[in-house]
């Protein structure tokens, strides 16, 4: 029997919001977590992705005493389109910064630039330098 679950991690558009009037649906931007038979698929990388990453990191740390014993974090991230509200959490997705992580990212070409170029600019460009 297949095991399938969906969790909405962010459903806001344009920008995240933190206000008591918005607690019912949360304040994070686009991010949906889908688990299919133990495979993690993430739809869009809005600010909801930050919590997904933190939870993955917690499981990773709990899985062994050191990086040699730990189970690598695995996920497939699908980016629907290159808009800021669909990428705001990407730079803060902690599994990206752990060398043993196995994160596959797929998305559309935008304005004749590849997804890799767009994400490189986001991660290493002047607006968010990680040296």
Protein language model annotation of sequence segments:
Residues 1-131:
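Binuclear metal-dependent hydrolase catalytic cores
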């Amino acid at each position: 029997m297949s095991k399938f679950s969906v969790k909405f991690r962010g459903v806001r558009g344009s920008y995240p919001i933190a206000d008591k009037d918005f607690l019912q649906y949360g304040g994070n931007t686009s991010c949906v977590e889908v688990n299919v038979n133990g495979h993690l698929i993430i739809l869009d990388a809005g600010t909801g992705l930050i919590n997904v990453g933190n939870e993955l990191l917690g499981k990773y740390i709990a899985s062994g005493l050191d990086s040699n014993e730990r189970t690598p974090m695995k996920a497939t991230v699908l980016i629907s389109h290159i808009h800021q509200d669909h990428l705001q959490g990407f730079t803060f997705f902690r599994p990206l910064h752990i060398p043993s992580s196995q994160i596959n990212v797929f998305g559309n070409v935008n304005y004749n630039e590849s997804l890799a170029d767009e994400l490189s600019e986001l991660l290493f460009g002047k607006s968010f330098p990680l040296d």
